[in-house]
From Swiss-Prot:
Active site: 816 (proton acceptor)
Tissue expression per record: Expressed in seedlings, roots, rosette leaves, stems, inflorescences, flowers and siliques.
Catalytic reaction list: L-seryl-[protein] + ATP = O-phospho-L-seryl-[protein] + ADP + H(+); L-threonyl-[protein] + ATP = O-phospho-L-threonyl-[protein] + ADP + H(+)
The keyword Disulfide bond belongs to this UniProt entry's keyword annotation: no
Protein name (record): Leucine-rich repeat receptor-like serine/threonine-protein kinase BAM2
Topological domains, Extracellular: 23-636
Enzyme Commission number(s) of this protein: 2.7.11.1
Function text: Necessary for male gametophyte development, as well as ovule specification and function. Involved in cell-cell communication process required during early anther development, and regulating cell division and differentiation to organize cell layers. Required for the development of high-ordered vascular strands within the leaf and a correlated control of leaf shape, size and symmetry. May regulate the CLV1-dependent CLV3-mediated signaling in meristems maintenance.
Gene: BAM2
InterPro entries named in the record: Kinase-like_dom_sf (IPR011009), Leu-rich_rpt (IPR001611), Leu-rich_rpt_typical-subtyp (IPR003591), LRR_dom_sf (IPR032675), LRR_N_plant-typ (IPR013210), LRR_R13L4/SHOC2-like (IPR055414), Plant_RL_S/T_kinase (IPR051716), Prot_kinase_dom (IPR000719)
Subunit structure: Interacts with BAM1 and CLV1. Binds to the CLV3, CLE11, CLE18, CLE19, CLE22, CLE25, CLE26, CLE40, CLE41 and CLE42 mature peptides, probably via its extracellular leucine-rich repeat region.
């Protein structure tokens, strides 16, 4: 009986256990499991709303059916989630929509998602999912309409199994690491409308089977892919295609004429490829075209006559090709044309005279061609023209008076032509004007600046090398915002007006090669931001004003070839910022000072003044003070040499004895850990990390290892380069490390501890899982580093450097600022790293300690070449290079030809004008807020100014970066349409955006 009862009890336990195991996971438990798999920001609504006090149908992102029992939609986009995606999401059987876009979710995509048979919409874009695509999804998700995996870390070949999803209408696989060829079976989807494989590592030929997707409306295959050959002619079979983007993917050959069959196409982007031959006439058959960009190719021949049929065209970019011939007259008659950019070709003939008469023209850039004739008279008839660039042609005639009434105009660059006549008198009164470049022409007349209002945005006026004459009006003092005023090489006469002292933003003043007379206006010294002053080759007379010595940041002063008299002010010696002067060929007299800054100037700065005396200029006459030093006798010199020899021998003996004692001491000395916070590991744990497999970086300062401590904490261990015994502790090395260990700032990599045995030094830092900015930006994933993230990194790194320069005690100069020394944590937050070359500022604000070379190639400030000194402004220059990297996506050196770095390249491309940033912007970036990029580019140009004193401080950099100008929504929309022209843009802030990165037109 007992045995029977025991068996019965065991049977009941087994049945109970079976029911427990078989009990299905409820949808509530599935959601809670999903929540537990995420790492959630403390401010996330998931923490506040996802709790058991309310029904799960009311939780953030959860939508249920009418019965309020089953989840039908789960949208957790943009909630700053990290962690992994739990496979329990598969226990939401009626789920139709799953969107986790714009988070930081990692790990593989769970194959269990294939059990969600009702799923229609799956959006996992803008995360960090990795691994290969699970083929199980293709067999289970038979009702799937939308699959968006854009911008993840998925690898392997493009999944062929996806062709089983016959209901698919939208497929976005762009921005991953997919490799191999586009499968031929990708031409078999019966109802597909959107296909994007851009931004991967695809190779091979574009399969002709793509032409079978007759329902396709949008096709994106460019950016980072490297296809063989060109476009297949079958592309012409995509009769429903509206947008086609094949930019920057290595295409060659000619554009197939079959493309003319795409009668619904409104956007065609084929820029940055290697297309050759002539532009096919069949493009003119696509009357629906609105935006066409064929720039940065190798097209030859003329603009096709068939383009006259493109009546809807708003954007036409053909710049940087090898096109020639005349610009057809019909270009000027296109009724909708807003953007026309034909620069850097070989166009000849005249500009179509009707250009702009449609009243819609916004951007016109015809620079660097061989155009002749006159300027069209009505380019601004609609008062919408913002940018007018005809730089570097052979244009003649006068500047149309209508431009003086073009209130929308912001930039006018018509230098290096043969223009004559006078400058329109209203030009400088235009309210939005920021830049006027009319240099190297034959303009005559006076400077048309009246007492009326001028634009406060007018920052640059370049009228160099013309035939302008007359005196400068007093109203020149109304140019309150001008930073560069270049009037050299003209025939201006009269005195320099004292009102020039009101130009408080002026940094560069060039009045050389004119006929100015009278005394130098001492009011110039009130322009406290001036760094460059050139008044040479005029008829100026009188003394050099003593007030000039109060210009604290002046770098360059040229007063040569005038009629100046008197002595050179001795106080100029105290102008520490002054690095170049020229007083030659005047009537100056007296002794040239030999102290202070004068010790840096050579005799060529003073020649041509017969009454000057001093070094290199001959002895001073009677009555002129000069010091007389009796030369040393031969006996005294011999005694000095013998004394120095004896001291050297004594020093060598002492050094040998000291080295031996240090060696013996180090052999007996064990490893010693200096901790800068509470640590749960020892030096032995750190030493265990010093393995070849753990190396994550090598540099001049040493080797960096990734270390895992006993409790699982990750650290970065920097083993400093081997030094001679004890040398690492010379010059206050220990004190420096102690100081670094005390630094606590959100945007500076934290030094946790320091291990040393007097032979080897190990610095233990917090670990940054996303590596360096340089690795990310210049690696394949750089294209997925969105503008918002780039701006955030720039601002955070600036804040870190600002702390070192202004708030740290003692103040620190980094000395090696570069993108590889800006590290990114798991949230892509920036941290300034690597103080291996840093030295501490003294109270005087200058660095007295020098290393062999301060900085890395491409980042070194130009003044280092002749001063061999670094200070905060050297760091500012290097940071400016980092900003240019973020904007252009290019490395500092190696991409621009021998001897050309990124700063020189950017200057040549943009002429140092911030509004030309679109000519150098990273082609991998999606559409961006142009005013923000322009603002950051402006900051970069300030940082890389050649003269150190012209650069802002890091505190000013932070302030300027945070003060991005806001523009009204209407203007922002207008600006975006002006630049991208209905390009397939992706809104970075939108988690559901399905388009791949588009290319800014400039």
């Amino acid at each position: 009986m007992k045995l029977l009862l025991l068996l019965l009890l065991l049977l009941l336990l087994h049945i109970s256990h079976s029911f427990t195991v078989a009990k299905p996971i409820t949808e509530l438990h599935a959601l809670l499991s999903l929540k537990s798999s995420f790492t959630i920001d403390e401010h996330s609504p998931l923490l506040t709303s996802w709790n058991l006090s309310t029904t799960f149908c009311s939780w953030t992102g959860v939508t249920c059916d009418v019965s309020l029992r089953h989840v039908t939609s789960l949208d957790l986009s943009g909630l700053n989630l990290s962690g992994t995606l739990s496979s329990d999401v598969a226990h939401l059987p009626l789920l139709q929509n799953l969107s986790l876009a714009a988070n930081q979710i990692s790990g593989p995509i769970p194959p269990q998602i294939s059990n969600l048979y009702e799923l229609r919409h799956l959006n996992l874009s803008n995360n960090v999912f990795n691994g290969s695509f699970p083929d199980e999804l293709s067999s289970g998700l038979v009702n799937l309409r939308v699959l968006d995996l854009y911008n993840n870390n998925l690898t392997g070949d493009l999944p062929v199994s996806l062709t089983n999803l016959t209901q698919l209408r939208h497929l976005h696989l762009g921005g991953n690491y997919f490799s191999g060829k586009i499968p031929a079976t990708y031409g078999t989807w019966p109802v597909l409308e959107y296909l994007a494989v851009s931004g991967n590592e695809l190779t091979g030929k574009i399969p002709p089977e793509i032409g079978n997707l007759t329902t396709l409306r949008e096709l994106y295959i460019g950016y980072y892919n490297a296809f063989e050959n060109g476009l297949p002619p079958e592309i012409g079979n995509l009769s429903e295609l509206v947008r086609f983007d094949a930019a920057n993917c290595g295409l060659t050959g000619e554009i197939p004429p079959e493309i003319g069959k795409l009668q619904k196409l409104d956007t065609l982007f084929l820029q940055v490829n290697a297309f050759t031959g002539t532009i096919t006439q069949e493009l003119g058959l696509i009357s629906s075209l609105k935006s066409m960009d064929l720039s940065n190719n190798m097209f030859t021949g003329e603009i096709p006559t068939s383009f006259s049929q493109l009546k809807n065209l708003t954007l036409l970019n053909l710049f940087r090709n090898k096109l020639y011939g005349a610009i057809p007259e019909f270009i000027g008659e296109m009724p909708e044309l807003e953007v026309l950019q034909l620069w850097e070709n070989n166009f000849t003939g005249s500009i179509p005279q009707k250009l702009g008469e449609n009243g819609r023209l916004v951007i016109l850039d015809l620079s660097s061609n061989k155009l002749t004739g006159t300027l069209p008279p009505n380019m601004c008839s609609g008062n919408r023209l913002m940018t007018l660039i005809t730089l570097g042609n052979f244009l003649f005639g006068s500047i149309p008076d209508s431009l003086g009434k073009c209130e929308s105009l912001t930039r006018i660059r018509m230098g290096e032509n043969f223009l004559n006549g006078s400058i329109p008198k209203e030009l400088f009164g235009l309210p939005k004007l920021s830049q006027v470049e009319l240099q190297d022409n034959y303009l005559t007349g006076e400077l048309p600046i009246s007492g009326g209002g001028v634009s406060g945005d007018l920052g640059q006026i370049s009228l160099s090398n013309n035939q302008l004459s007359g005196s400068l009006p007093a109203a020149i003092g109304n140019l309150s915002g001008v930073q560069k005023l270049l009037l050299d090489g003209n025939k201006f006469s009269g005195s320099i007006p004292p009102e020039i002292g009101r130009l408080q933003q002026l940094s560069k003043l060039d009045f050389s090669h004119n006929l100015f007379s009278g005394r130098i206006a001492p009011e110039i010294s009130r322009c406290k931001l001036l760094t460059f002053v050139d008044l040479s080759r005029n008829e100026l007379s009188g003394d050099i004003p003593n007030e000039l010595t109060g210009m604290k940041i002046l770098n360059y002063l040229n007063l040569s070839r005038n009629h100046l008299v008197g002595s050179i002010p001795v106080t100029i010696a105290s102008m520490q910022s002054l690095t170049s002067v020229d007083f030659s060929y005047n009537n100056l007299s007296g002794l040239v000072p030999s102290t202070g800054q004068f010790s840096y100037f050579n005799y060529t700065s003073f020649v041509g003044n017969s009454h000057l005396c001093g070094p290199y200029l001959g002895p001073c006459g009677k009555g002129t003070h000069q010091s007389h030093v009796k030369p040393l006798s031969a006996t005294t010199k011999l005694l000095l040499v013998l004394g120095l020899l004896f001291c050297s021998m004594v020093f060598a003996i002492v050094a040998i004895i000291k080295a031996r004692s240090l060696r013996n001491a180090s052999e007996a000395k064990a490893w010693r850990l200096t901790a800068f916070q509470r640590l749960d590991f020892t030096c032995d744990d750190v030493l265990d990390s010093l393995k070849e497999d753990n190396i994550i970086g090598k540099g001049g300062a040493g080797i960096v290892y990734k270390g895992t401590m006993p409790k699982g904490d990750l650290v970065a261990v920097k083993r400093l380069a081997t030094m001679s015994h004890g040398s690492s502790h010379d010059h206050g090395f220990n004190a420096e490390i102690q100081t670094l260990g005390r630094i606590r700032h959100r945007h500076i990599v934290r030094l946790l501890g320091f291990c040393s045995n007097h032979e080897t030094n190990l610095l233990v830092y917090e670990y940054m899982p996303n590596g360096s900015l340089g690795e990310v930006l210049h690696g394949k994933k750089g294209g997925h580093l969105h503008w918002n993230t780039r701006y955030k990194i720039a601002l955070e790194a600036a804040k870190g450097l600002c702390y070192l320069h202004h708030d740290c005690s003692p103040l620190i100069v980094h000395r090696d600022v570069k993108s590889n020394n800006i590290l990114l944590d798991s949230n892509f937050e920036a941290h300034v790293a690597d103080f291996g070359l840093a030295k501490f500022l003294q109270d005087s604000g200058t660095s007295e300690c020098m290393s062999a070379i301060a900085g890395s190639y491409g980042y070194i400030a130009p003044e280092y070449a002749y001063t061999l000194k670094v200070d905060e402004k050297s760091d500012v220059y290097s940071f400016g290079v980092v900003l240019l990297e973020l904007i252009t996506g290019k490395k500092p050196v190696g991409e621009f030809g021998d001897g050309v770095d990124i700063v020189q390249w950017v200057r040549s491309m943009t002429d140092s004008n911030k509004d030309c940033v679109l000519k150098v912007i990273d082609l991998r970036l999606s559409s961006v807020p142009v005013h923000e990029v322009t603002h950051v580019f402006y900051v970069a140009l300030l940082c890389v100014e050649e003269q150190a004193v012209e650069r802002p401080t890091m505190r000013e950099v932070v302030q300027i970066l945070t003060e991005i100008p806001k523009i009204p929504l209407s203007k922002q929309q207008a600006a975006e349409s002006d630049v991208t022209e209905k390009a397939p843009a992706i809104n970075e802030s939108s988690p559901d955006s399905g388009s791949p990165p588009d290319l800014l037109s400039n």
